[in-house]
UniProtKB/Swiss-Prot annotation:
Function of the molecule: Specifically methylates position 2 of adenine 2503 in 23S rRNA and position 2 of adenine 37 in tRNAs. m2A2503 modification seems to play a crucial role in the proofreading step occurring at the peptidyl transferase center and thus would serve to optimize ribosomal fidelity.
First and last residue of the signal peptide: none
Other remarks on this protein: Reaction proceeds by a ping-pong mechanism involving intermediate methylation of a conserved cysteine residue.
Recorded name of the encoding gene: rlmN
Name of this protein: Dual-specificity RNA methyltransferase RlmN
GO MF annotation terms: 4 iron, 4 sulfur cluster binding; metal ion binding; rRNA (adenine(2503)-C2-)-methyltransferase activity; rRNA binding; tRNA (adenine(37)-C2)-methyltransferase activity; tRNA binding
Positions with a binding annotation for S-adenosyl-L-methionine: G170, E171, S202, S224, L225, H226, N302
Organism for this UniProt entry: Pseudomonas entomophila (strain L48)
Gene Ontology biological process: rRNA base methylation; tRNA methylation
Length: 379
């Protein structure tokens, strides 16, 4: 992609695209691999640092290309070790990237859009409205920046980032081409060399793009379900009105059937007090997913201002999990991480220059709802 400087940003190019770039400037294709290693293995953003690239070629690259990642605005570290970066992208909006360390892995949660157009009712990102898709460089740039922050050089040795989940701000499948390119770089040996089993794309259910996915890439798939029936899901996840559950699950199963091995669909389900956490919801979920090879990840709601929802009690969470277990499912409840720095699931907001004006409308409605009503003034 050409940036505002008129130069090609090499950060977001796949290996095939990098080879095409070197063809276009009259250079041999093996240079693509050399430059990719410098960018992604070593975090280099200066052609002068590429010591196995000749001076003449370095000067040529300097004239027509650049390596530009998103700008880090802030970095916060939680008491539990979770890190959150706020990064500014070309549109002027800010998005958030979260790193979650555990004993056996380090998971990076990556954003795909500045804001989100889907307006899921329990997600703070959706309340920010939508500005733009991130470029491939801005998506993979979050991995690049995080890797540089850890000082892991090269990226594939003693790596801090073992897993990447496309679960940050935005709906990845509504930024299809750029997300596909970024995930290819994540898995490319000359990029970050992350196993396809350790790269997960999460979707709220853009059925045509799920159907298209297998033609382009092989990664793990997670479905943001959040409701066991169409009536409730229409309210929580409005895209369900266009792509209802039967159609959605058939699409997911079609994609999963193309993958090798014993890989299963991950079901994400945010538990909302008295909304979708009752025994009847668990029973409906068991029936809905009976023939779907899957694992279920329960996510207790992480509150944000004026959300209108509450987190269920620990007893209600355990009850729901136990009911699903007894129904024969592999179920885990996600431990809340990074909530003290607003980095928990559903809390990512960034700073979005909202083209939909949804955030203005949302704030106005919530303020009206919070105002005390004068009963004497009512008819």
């Amino acid at each position: 992609m050409t940036t505002s400087t008129g130069k090609i940003n090499l950060l977001g190019l796949t290996l095939a695209e990098m080879e095409q770039f070197f063809d276009s400037i009259g250079e041999k294709r093996f240079r693509a691999g050399q430059v990719m290693k410098w960018i992604h293995h070593f975090g280099v953003d200066d052609f002068a640092a590429m010591t196995n690239v000749g001076k003449v070629l370095r000067e040529k690259l300097e004239a027509v290309a650049e390596i530009r990642g998103p700008e880090v605005v802030s970095e916060d570290i939680s008491a539990d070790g979770t890190r959150k970066w706020v990064v500014r992208v070309a549109s002027g909006s800010c998005v958030e990237t979260v790193y979650i360390p555990t004993d056996d892995r380090g998971t990076l949660c990556v954003s795909s859009q500045a804001g989100c157009a889907l307006d899921c009712s329990f997600c703070s990102t959706g309340k920010q409205g939508f500005n733009s898709n991130l470029t491939a460089a801005e998506v993979i740039g979050q991995v690049w920046l995080a890797n540089k922050s850890f000082g892991t050089v090269p990226a594939k040795i003693d790596r801090a980032i073992t897993n990447v989940v496309m679960m940050g701000m935005g709906e990845p499948l509504l930024n299809f081409d750029n997300v596909i390119a970024a995930m290819k770089i994540m898995m490319e040996d000359l990029g970050y060399g992350i196993s396809k089993r350790r790269v997960t794309l999460s979707t709220s259910g853009v059925v045509p793009m799920i159907d298209e996915l297998a033609k382009h890439i092989d990664v793990s798939l997670a479905l943001s379900l959040h409701a066991p029936n169409d009536e409730l899901r229409n309210k929580l996840v409005p895209i369900n009105k266009k792509y209802p559950l039967k159609m959605l699950l058939e699409s997911c199963m079609g994609y999963m059937s193309t993958l090798g091995g014993k890989r299963v669909l991950t079901i994400e389900y945010t538990l909302l007090k008295d909304v979708n956490d009752q025994p009847e919801h668990a029973a409906q979920m068991i029936e809905l997913l009976r023939d779907v090879p899957c694992k279920i990840n329960l996510i207790p709601f992480n509150p944000f201002p004026h959300s209108g929802y509450e987190r269920p009690s620990n007893n209600a969470i355990r009850r729901f999990q136990d009911l699903l277990h007894h129904g024969g499912f592999n179920v885990t409840t996600r431990t809340t991480r990074g909530d003290d720095i607003d980095a928990a699931c559903g809390q990512l907001v960034g700073q979005v220059n909202d083209r939909t004006r949804r955030s203005e409308r949302y704030i106005a409605v919530r303020q009206l709802a919070d105002e005390p009503q004068d009963s004497a003034a009512r008819p």
